[in-house]
């Protein structure tokens, strides 16, 4: 009991550090008491479940924490009277600009020094007819990617930009249907072609639709879009678009889509956006995809990997070529996993290293017991005291630069709601669990803090109520710059070496 009381007290201290009860310092109000009690309740629930919790030892909060500098880089305009719901930041080196999207529809370009922010395109503009569905926290303009030949005149990919967007327009016939659910809305992959890639604003015509998904439920609808940045012209991998397609939502994958090889849901797909051998003729299915002509019957040829729940982010290691994905778990396990062609990451037979039983239960027996599955390299428990009630893995980037030596050779990832950022070795990949995870804190000139604490301080300066969650994402810029985005204060931040921060 004494140890549990110590754990509770430490959790309160951590809550003050990470911003969960930032307003309570020196101000014993009803709001303060309520927040403290909420933290205590969360901790008590966590401690009560330690006998069945796969991660009974919490992530180290202080001793092993890595501290780096952080500064404000750029401000993105509000939309609908609220902070921009920033989702993704992408470097487009051909035009020497960063691009960041707001889930409500706008896509902004940001100069490399952060001083110029320009709306490049607005997917929600009536004349495009996209009808962006962004009424709920998970829906909207999900992701985007520039073709690697975007700024190369005379090539087939010149001027081409791809977006993945939820839409309320469900009239067109979908290419992929879930076979159940409530037909919540559709998610569409669109191709936009600008005439002048270096122009300040998009000057092309209406988008071309490549793929349309009928969504069974209102969450887990999108994912990430990216071209492999390590591929070169002439290589078979060059110009192939990877797309994270979540399991369609509700909870527990009730339609069993992630393990269904006839379904596009719960998968990482790989297509040739400039090809035409798909069923609808609007994109290509690469001949080297793992399930093409592999004797798997009616398995979809678009599938690159299966068994994912909500693959929000994936990236490649510039040194090893490894592809890693941050996949959001159900109610117990968050994970980061290696992805290879044909890999089965387990969902919904497995949640992380543990057999999935129900939305709130996994089995601790026979951990990592199926040799056919690809299990996480790291995973963490949603009940960890550092986190909020809801957790969601995000990231993920491999930092191979030396500008910030504390981060060199680390895989960086984070937890979306809490704003916690973590790292683990990219050279000595763990084999599951959370023991290898290091917490990362940020110093803006006033001591180490979490991203949520930084957001709350900014909210107060903006005259707003402090946010209770971060909704944080990471982005990678030129020369391996690491950017931090969120949906709560409109600020893009960039990591810097310690000592480069002005208080």
Regions found by a protein language model. Give the residues of each.
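Extended hydrophobic/aromatic segments used for targeting, binding, or gating
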Residues: 338, 352-355, 419-484
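Repeat-solenoid scaffold signature
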Residues: 297-335
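N-terminal secretory signal peptides that target proteins for export/translocation
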Residues: 1-32
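Acidic, Gly/Ser/Thr-rich repeat motifs that build Ca2+-stabilized beta-propeller blades
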Residues: 49-252, 313-316, 321-329, 389-428, ...
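Acidic/polar, solvent-exposed loop segments in beta-strand-rich repeat domains
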Residues: 250-263
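Loop/turn-rich, solvent-exposed surfaces of beta-rich toroidal or solenoidal domains
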Residues: 357-446
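Blade-edge beta-strand/turn elements of extracellular beta-propeller
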Residues: 59-80, 115-135, 192-216, 267-307, ...
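Bacterial N-terminal signal peptides
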Residues: 34-44
């Amino acid at each position: 009991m004494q140890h549990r009381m110590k754990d509770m007290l430490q959790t309160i201290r951590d809550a003050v550090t990470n911003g969960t009860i930032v307003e309570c310092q020196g101000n014993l109000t009803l709001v303060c008491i309520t927040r403290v009690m909420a933290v205590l309740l969360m901790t008590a629930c966590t401690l009560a479940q330690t006998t069945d919790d796969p991660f009974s030892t919490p992530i180290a909060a202080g001793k092993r924490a890595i501290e780096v500098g952080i500064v404000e880089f750029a401000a993105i305009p509000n939309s609908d009277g609220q902070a921009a719901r920033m989702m993704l930041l992408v470097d487009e080196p051909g035009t020497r600009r960063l691009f960041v999207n707001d889930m409500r529809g706008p896509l902004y370009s940001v100069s490399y020094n952060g001083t110029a922010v320009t709306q490049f395109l607005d997917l929600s503009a009536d004349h495009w007819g996209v009808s962006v569905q962004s009424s709920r926290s998970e829906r909207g303009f999900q992701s985007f990617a520039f073709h690697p030949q975007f700024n190369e005149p005379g090539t087939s990919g010149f001027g081409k930009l791809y977006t993945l967007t939820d839409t309320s327009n469900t009239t067109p016939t979908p290419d992929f249907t879930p076979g159940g659910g409530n037909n919540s809305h559709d998610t569409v992959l669109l191709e936009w072609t600008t005439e002048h890639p270096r122009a300040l604003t998009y000057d092309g015509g209406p988008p071309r639709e490549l793929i349309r998904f009928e969504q069974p439920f209102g969450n887990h609808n999108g994912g990430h879009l990216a071209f492999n940045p390590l591929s070169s012209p002439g290589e078979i991998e060059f110009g192939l678009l990877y797309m994270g397609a979540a399991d369609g939502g509700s909870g527990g994958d009730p339609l069993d889509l992630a393990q269904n090889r006839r379904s596009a849901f719960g998968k990482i797909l790989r297509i040739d956006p400039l090809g035409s051998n798909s069923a609808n003729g609007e994109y290509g299915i690469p001949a080297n995809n793992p399930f093409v002509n592999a004797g798997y019957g009616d398995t979809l040829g678009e599938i690159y990997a299966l068994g994912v729940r909500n693959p929000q982010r994936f990236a490649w290691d510039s040194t090893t070529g490894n592809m890693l994905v941050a996949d959001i778990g159900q109610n117990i396990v968050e994970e980061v996993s290696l992805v290879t062609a044909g890999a089965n990451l387990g969902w919904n037979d497995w949640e992380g290293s543990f057999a999935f039983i129900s939305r709130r239960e996994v089995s601790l027996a026979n951990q990592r017991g199926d040799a056919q599955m690809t299990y996480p390299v790291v995973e963490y428990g949603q009940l960890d005291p550092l986190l909020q009630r809801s957790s969601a893995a995000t990231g993920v980037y491999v930092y191979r630069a030396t500008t910030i030596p504390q981060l060199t050779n680390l895989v960086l990832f984070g937890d979306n709601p809490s704003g916690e950022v973590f790292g683990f070795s990219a050279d000595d990949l763990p084999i599951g669990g959370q023991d290898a995870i290091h917490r990362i804190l940020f110093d803006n000139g006033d001591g180490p803090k979490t991203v949520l604490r930084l957001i709350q301080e900014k909210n107060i300066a903006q005259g707003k109520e402090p946010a209770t969650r971060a909704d944080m994402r990471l982005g990678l810029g030129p020369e391996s710059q690491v950017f931090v985005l969120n949906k709560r204060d409109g600020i893009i931040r960039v990591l810097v070496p310690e000592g480069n921060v002005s208080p």
